[in-house]
């Protein structure tokens, strides 16, 4: 098992996210539990390219202080929604013989959705801990509606096991 922390970058990790305090607490708790139980924590950052708001070299590109990686923890950069496409993550997980990926981070309706579905298609058991992903309101849905749609309907029982933070930690302890 690994804990995959997706796109928790300074530019977009803020109180405008749906249920921010619960999200922040869940992610911090899971990162600490993973480290305590020798579950590898892997980070992914999104780069929209030169001239975009979210691009390498600007302060907002770096990982949010509250979730920051420790020395030696892997960081993969991506340019598309999926954490698996063209990043080396897939090859790394296969090489390490990883079968289970717990996914946390941003944004529910973009990169988390793509990462969960692509991970599932690559044969990984995907775990989505409750309150450990979030998003913003958009033109069609509130952040809350997006969160509930994906976590309680789209992924659950199809692409991922959607469980509590506590259940996720129990799985970490058994690894």
In which residue ranges do the predicted regions lie?
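Short coil-to-beta-strand
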Residues: 1-7
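Active-site-adjacent betaalpha module
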Residues: 2, 29-35, 54-175
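Short beta-to-alpha linker loops that shape the active-site pocket of alpha/beta-hydrolase fold enzymes
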Residues: 9, 47, 132
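Short acidic, Gly/Ser-rich segments with clustered Asp/Glu that frequently serve as metal-coordination loops
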Residues: 9-15
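Short, glycine/acidic-enriched capping/hinge loops at junctions between secondary-structure elements
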Residues: 15-17, 53-55
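A short alpha/beta connector and helix-capping loop motif
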Residues: 16-47
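Glycine-rich, proline-tolerant flexible connector loops at the mouths of alpha/beta enzymes
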Residues: 48-52
């Amino acid at each position: 098992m690994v804990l995959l922390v997706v796109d928790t970058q300074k530019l977009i990790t803020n109180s405008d996210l749906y249920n921010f305090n619960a999200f922040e607490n869940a992610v911090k708790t899971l990162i600490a539990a993973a480290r305590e139980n020798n579950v590898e924590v892997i980070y992914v950052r999104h780069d929209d390219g030169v001239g975009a708001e979210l691009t390498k070299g600007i302060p907002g590109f770096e990982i949010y202080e509250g979730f920051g990686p420790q020395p030696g923890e892997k960081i993969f950069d991506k340019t598309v929604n999926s954490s698996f496409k063209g990043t080396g993550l897939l090859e790394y997980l296969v090489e390490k013989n990883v079968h289970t990926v717990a996914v946390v981070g941003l944004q529910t309706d973009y990169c988390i959705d793509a990462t969960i579905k692509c991970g599932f298609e690559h044969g990984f058991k995907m775990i989505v801990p409750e309150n450990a992903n979030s998003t913003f309101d958009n033109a069609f849905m509130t952040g809350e509606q997006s969160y509930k749609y994906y976590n309680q309907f789209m992924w659950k029982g199809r692409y991922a096991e959607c469980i509590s933070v506590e259940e996720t930690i129990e799985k970490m302890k058994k690894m």
